[in-house]
Design a protein with these regions (language model features):
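Catalytic His-Asp segment of secreted/periplasmic serine-dependent ester chemistry enzymes
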Residues: 360-433
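Structural recognition of the beta-strand scaffold that forms the well-ordered cores
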Residues: 117, 247-252, 256-257, 282-287, ...
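Surface-exposed amphipathic alpha-helices with a cationic face
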Residues: 341-351, 380
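Bacterial N-terminal signal peptides that target proteins for export
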Residues: 1-10
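N-terminal secretory targeting modules
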Residues: 24-251, 256-257, 261-263
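Conserved SGNH/GDSL esterase-like catalytic core that processes O-acyl groups on lipids
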Residues: 245-250, 255-341, 363-365, 373, ...
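Short, structured coil segments at secondary-structure junctions
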Residues: 279, 350, 385-386
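C-terminal motif of bacterial Sec signal peptides marking the signal peptidase cleavage site
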Residues: 18-21
Length: 433
């Protein structure tokens, strides 16, 4: 497995933009778990996992030798929402469509914000027919963009609309594969209120976030009559200049993103970890539905964003087992092990503390469960190899008698989110004090 190329001027010169319009394409609400169940042989029964519960307590050999992270907009304007806003889908065409999203913030009050955009797809969606890792976006126009106080929910009046500008202008022409930041904007979000992001875009081939129903998202052709939209272009980072003592990022699939948990309740494990750590720890959720470890291992653009954070949670495996690398077939345990090795190697070289999760239970049948079991036996060794930390995600979401059974669902529900968050903070909470 070839290691990811070193990041050079990318972090200082990134200027990508992502915009996507809700198209008429039918929503694909099927989950990775459902697909897995449909594709495996029905003649084989689920086998016990026996995944290793050993944790790697090995620290980096000398933390003083870690490379110092350069000061960039990524480190100055850190994430201020637990909602994942990356690109895992692609809107074919939008004509003056206005998109609106309600975003919960981690720290309330008056803060200076900047927003980062990338006009490239981060990860593969299902088999990659429409969107795949590294797919280039087309050109599009931003007519206007604003942030506002959304009140305590969608029934409240939206107030304090504030323009977001780009190079001093309210409009912007975005080129294919461009990446960029907005200008700074100061915004006050009162305690318990949502930030509302809204913009109007036109163009073709706009990367977007799909499975965005964790929060209220909508589109409008006239800027007034909004309807639910599950394919929505958003900034990839809702960045705020915050005085935090630690930064944490999580990169993974729909389980990290929080899919199939109750809308606007933020009960998924990543959100609950963020809540328990408190607002003086910035949490950046980079989970994307259908993402694979092979996507992250081949996409420095996506991986480089999380590498700006002090600690990075890496949580992949399910979709590599179910669907495999884009353009390929289902991945073997050995192949997934190589992808994870490349990811952890890259992140440790960038000075990140890495917490590596194993693959969670999915009620797989025999073939896929065998791959998951073999993979989970390998993962602690990756953590040990790089001085990373290991978290037995799988054991928390199953039982000792039935290690392959997803007790809280293939996409863990709120109860499962609490179990994971409690165990995570108990094991690693002192690292963030």
């Amino acid at each position: 497995m070839k290691k990811i190329k070193s990041l050079t001027a990318l972090l200082l010169a990134l200027s990508i933009c992502a915009v996507t319009a809700c198209s008429s394409q039918p929503a694909d609400s099927s989950s990775a778990t459902e697909s897995a169940s449909a594709t495996e042989s029905s003649t084989d029964s689920t086998t016990a996992s026996g995944a290793s519960s050993e944790t790697s307590s090995k620290e980096s050999s000398d933390t003083s030798t870690k490379p110092e992270k350069p000061v960039t907009d990524f480190t100055t304007y850190v994430s201020n929402t637990v909602v994942s806003t990356g690109n895992n889908f692609y809107i074919e065409k939008a004509e003056n469509i206005t998109y609106r999203a309600y975003l919960p913030v981690e720290q309330y009050g008056e803060l200076e914000y900047k927003f980062f955009f990338t006009n490239t797809v981060d990860s593969t969606y299902t088999k990659g027919k429409i969107a795949f890792v590294g797919k280039s976006g087309g050109s599009y126009t931003i007519s206007n963009a604003t942030v506002a106080d959304g009140g305590t929910g969608v029934e409240d009046e939206i107030t304090n609309r504030t323009p977001v500008t780009f190079g001093g202008k309210e409009t912007k022409e975005v080129a294919a594969d461009e990446s960029y930041w907005s200008d700074p904007v100061t915004m006050n979000i009162p305690e318990g209120h949502y930030m509302v992001w809204e913009w109007t875009v036109s163009g073709e081939g706009i990367p977007c976030n799909k499975m965005s129903s964790l929060t209220s998202t909508a589109s409008s052709a006239d800027g007034e009559t909004f309807k639910f939209c599950d394919e929505i272009p958003l900034p990839q980072i809702i960045g705020a200049k915050r005085d935090v003592k630690h930064t944490v990022a999580a990169i993974g699939d729909s389980i990290t993103q929080g899919c199939q948990t109750e809308q606007m309740k933020y009960e998924f494990w990543a959100s609950k970890i963020s809540t328990q750590l408190g607002s003086d720890v910035a949490f950046f959720n980079c989970g994307l539905g259908w993402a694979r470890a092979s996507d992250a291992a081949s996409n420095e653009n996506w991986l480089s964003r999380v590498s700006q954070y002090d600690t990075v949670i890496v949580a992949f495996g399910t979709n590599d087992i179910v669907s495999g690398k884009y353009g390929g077939k289902k991945s073997s345990a050995e192949e997934i092990d190589e992808y994870l090795d490349a990811i952890v190697s890259y992140l440790t070289e960038k000075g990140c503390d890495v917490i590596l999760f194993n693959a969670p239970p999915q009620d797989f049948k025999k073939t896929n469960e065998g791959v998951r079991t073999a993979l989970n036996e390998k993962i602690p060794a990756i953590a040990e190899k790089y001085g990373a930390k290991f978290f037995d995600f799988s054991a928390l979401l199953s039982t000792e008698d039935e290690p392959g059974k997803a007790v809280y669902g293939g996409h863990p529900n709120g109860e499962g989110g609490t179990v994971v968050a409690d165990a995570f903070v108990k094991q690693f909470g002192s690292l963030f004090e």
